[in-house]
Amino acid sequence: MEQDLRSIPASKLDKFIENHLPDTSFCADLREVIDALCALLKDRSFRGPVRRMRASKGVKGKGTTLKGRSDADLVVFLNNLTSFEDQLNQQGVLIKEIKKQLCEVQHERRCGVKFEVHSLRSPNSRALSFKLSAPDLLKEVKFDVLPAYDLLDHLNILKKPNQQFYANLISGRTPPGKEGKLSICFMGLRKYFLNCRPTKLKRLIRLVTHWYQLCKEKLGDPLPPQYALELLTVYAWEYGSRVTKFNTAQGFRTVLELVTKYKQLQIYWTVYYDFRHQEVSEYLHQQLKKDRPVILDPADPTRNIAGLNPKDWRRLAGEAAAWLQYPCFKYRDGSSVCSWEVPTEVGVPMKYLLCRIFWLLFWSLFHFIFGKTSSG
């Protein structure tokens, strides 16, 4: 498959993506099986009543999943989780409870589904893994089950959250060392961040995701998180194109070039949080001062999607540099595809206090000059 992609002319990349669209029939069958499993679990007696369960296939269900991927997350929202602190404090107990209930469902064999529940990796595991198979599914599916505080029960996904919400998240309600550990709570916001994008951009994300999987097969772990590459693709499009009909090869090349410049990356979005709240602003400035690469989660400012190990990026950057020489970045006449002009960093506004000082000085100077003129 790697040979197929790298040898395809730039003009044929769109056709290549079409051949790797999500397997819609498999998704539909998987959804039916998951719905049946969720219905059984909802009827059981958990330590706290299940509010609802949300299942998403592959890459968090964002419309960017590749054909042939058979992994999924099953997020369990429980009524007795009413805050981030609750999730952190009760996570281990809830994971054990979910494992117990899954084992009982498996023993009863009521939904025609077979699954193998794995042992917990550690007493503090944040997820429970199991494999599922069913007569309607052509392949086995690997699941991670995660209990979560239902954040979207308190937020409108279509509106910018009250910034006090983020101020509470970063000031005391998130224990030290737990930053970014609550990312599953933000799944809905994160999905919407990508779901609202143009169709062709989502297809470009699929292409980048496929490239990432090829690199992973060749290089193995550790590599930067796949979600970092997805966000990098969105960023490249936002700053380099912003049109719904663009040259796929140009977008692909731009993303790979950004990967090679990982030491310079400083990327964030202000879709859900911004610098207008003083406490949030101070925190964002601290986050953006950290060693690069920095790619802040659009929904959760406590989480640097780029990770903490630049060595992971160095390995991926080496592979990206090699790929830039392949035929997939050349036209039929042999000329090279040009990338979009995209900066490696997003500018950071002045701190709140400095901004106030600046305006006070400006205002004083204004009154001094014009007050003196009017009195004269």
Swiss-Prot record:
It is a single-pass type IV membrane protein. The chain crosses the membrane at residues 352-370. One of its GO terms (cellular component) is endoplasmic reticulum membrane. One of its GO terms (biological process) is negative regulation of viral genome replication. Residues 371-376 are extracellular. Residues 1-351 are cytoplasmic. It comes from the Eukaryota. GO terms for molecular function: double-stranded RNA binding. It holds the Pfam family OAS1_C. Changing S83Y: In strain: BID, DHA, MPR, MBT/Pas, PWD/Phj. Changing V50G: In strain: DHA. It is found in: Endoplasmic reticulum membrane. Interacts with OSBPL1A and ABCF3. Does not have 2'-5'-OAS activity, but can bind double-stranded RNA. The full-length protein displays antiviral activity against flaviviruses such as west Nile virus (WNV) via an alternative antiviral pathway independent of RNase L. The truncated form of the protein lacks antiviral activity. Belongs to the 2-5A synthase family. This is Inactive 2'-5'-oligoadenylate synthase 1B. It comes from Mus musculus (Mouse). The gene is Oas1b.
